[in-house]
Amino acid sequence: MFNRKYLIGGLIGLARMDDFDRDVYCLLGLPVDAVGMAEAVRRVRAAVTDERRCFFSTPNLNFLIACQTDREFRNSVIRSDLSVTDGMPLVWLARLLGLPIGERVPGSDLFEVLRGDQERVGRRIAVFFFGGEEGAAEQASQVLNESDCGLVCVGFLNPGFGSIEDMSSR
């Protein structure tokens, strides 16, 4: 169930989140980078070039709902190096609240751009799949690694849709 106080606090907390080293805003309690597709691609490419980790999240309504009850999942979004709006409802809400988030940045579209980057960076970019429906990450890993593109899947994990605590007690 939603915590109304938390949701209202997230709505009222419109200020820039100053504890990040980038232009991040709070949207219903989650950090969202104020970037479009071009800047998101630039940041990922810069991380690849500099050989830095770039853990990015693609919040949508499902993320917002999951983050209300799953602390571990919420913390993973907060710890992301890049958090882009993957859902139009989030973009509309940001606009309504006056946040400078102007466009949807679908993770799948960002992924497709990076698939063609092998020549640009001189090697395949290592990716790790996390989450999704049962078996989807494994299948995506196999398909990606059998293709001739700029990405290689180095692993995947699908912990299911329960909380970390629930899965640990099984």
Q: Which residues does each PLM region occupy?
A:
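Conserved beta-alpha
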Residues: V91-R170
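N-terminal nucleotide/polyanion-binding subdomain common to many enzyme families
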Residues: L7-D109
